[in-house]
Structure formats: C-alpha cells, structure tokens
Amino acid sequence: KNLFLDTASILEERIVRGSYTMDVFGGQNLEFGAERAQTILDSNLALGLFSDTEAPSSAFGGLSPVAIPNANTRVEEIRYEPFAIHNWRISPRMSLETSFVYESSEISMSGDVSNSRNFDFFKPKVDYRFDVTPQLQLRVLIEKFVRQLSFTDFVATSDQEDEDSNTLAGNSNLRPDYWWNYNFLAEYRLPNDQGVVSANFYHHRHKDFLQRIDVSTGPDDLRSAAGNIGTGDMQVF
C-alpha cells in the first residue's frame, strides 16, 4: 500500500423566509419579505504516502503523514436577503414584473485557515411580456445573478478525477461571481397545439468568473483549485 486518503465532512444549512403579498392598485400586487440563511461546513482531510525518510503513523494507515494546507477547516456563512417584487398586469396582452433583492453575507473560516469577509450585492430584475397575437409572445428580461459559492471549494478535498493528483486545493479567498443577463425571447405557438417554435438571444456579462486554476508548487506537486479568473462576455442565439 502506498496511498492513504481519508475525508470527512458535515454540511448544515438553516433557512428562514417570510413574505407578505398585497394588492396595491388594479392589476398590481406587491410582495415583500426577507430570508436568512446559515450554512456551515466542517471538513477534514488526511493524506498518507509511502516514504523512506518520514516516520509512518498508524493513524495514516501505516504510511507517512503529508501536510496539506487547509485540510481541517470550518466554513460558515450568514446571509440576509430582503426583497420586494412588483407584478403589474398592464393590459390583457402586457405584463411587467420587477424585483429588487439585496444580498448581504459574511463568510468566515476557522481551523487551518482563519479568514472573514463580507459581501454585498444588489440584484434587480425586469421581466416584460407582450402578446403580439394569441400565438406570438415576445419577452424581454434583464436580471443580475449572483452565484452561491460551493463550500467545498474553500477547503482541500480528495480528487477523484485526476490521476496525477490526490487532492484538490482549497481557496480561502474565493469571491462570488456574478453576471448581468440580457435576454430577448420570441415564442410562437403552432396551430392546433402542434407545438411551439421559439428563438432566444441572450448576452451575459460576467464578473469574477469562477473556474479551475493551477496552484501547483512544482512539477512533482500538481494541484488545482477553484478561483476567480476575471471578467468576460457571452452571447448565445
């Protein structure tokens, strides 16, 4: 035996959400509320390898312990999200939905890594729909998305896919990536309910995009980790 790999993790999540909906004017209603979420990850990783120079340990399957950065870490996020959503039936053929969401969160780490950071995002949305005819509908959507971070990207984990690496490094400095979505959609319903033909064009403008990055310390220590690689634009038709 020349490899010992032991992982253990516990993920907990608690969410409380409340909202209230009221009619304000003819064809309009307003929903407002708030959400609070707590997410906790306790992660542990142990790696043992055969070595002629390092002393073996029974806790590592009789192999020599290998020090892994960020292997025993607790990650916790507290997130608050107040919101307001306005729906307006302008006419039998037109509708408009607007929403305003404010996200405030604190992500803290303890254990092998000690770190605490705060993030604040404003996430508006405008969704306009127009029925040109009973068969043809046009839709314009503008929305800001903020991706929720995967807590396993913060800590070191085992690598099940790369034969050249036993572990994936964690990144304690990750930031949520976000993007603006500009979407135009046309949908046509075929006669006699034979189906739907649709065309969709959208443009995404990304910020702090998340991707795997190389964090190898040398040719004999190949590692990758999740990281923010910058900005970019994507267009799809």
Regions found by a protein language model. Give the residues of each.
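Residue-level signature of outer-membrane beta-barrel architecture
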Residues: 20-22, 88, 120, 128-131, ...
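Hydrophobic, lipid-facing positions within transmembrane beta-strands of outer-membrane proteins
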Residues: 12-18, 78-84, 122-126, 138, ...
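Surface-exposed extracellular loop regions of Gram-negative outer-membrane beta-barrel proteins
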Residues: 40-42, 106, 134-181, 201-227
